């Protein structure tokens, strides 16, 4: 299962579709965002994905976590959203 990485420039609907697809296929999705703009896009995508999945009769929960990520030899703090069926 791949991590869905979100940037501030990510299309919300594309990320929402990826989340919904991962839930349907793997019953779990992990979304990672670094920075306020990226976290904003990730949360909006999560809200859209809930609607997509609800129409399929799938109810999900989202568990936010802080994670440290190494980028170009620097450690950055990211938000990871773990999405699972309820």
Where does each model-flagged region fall?
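C-terminal edge-of-domain segments
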Residues: 54-86
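Short, hydrophobic/π-rich interface segment
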Residues: 36-62
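Short beta->alpha linker loops
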Residues: 10, 34-37
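Low-complexity, interaction-prone regions
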Residues: 1-2, 86
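Conserved mixed alpha/beta catalytic, RNA-binding, or beta-rich assembly cores of soluble enzyme
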Residues: 2-28, 42, 46, 50, ...
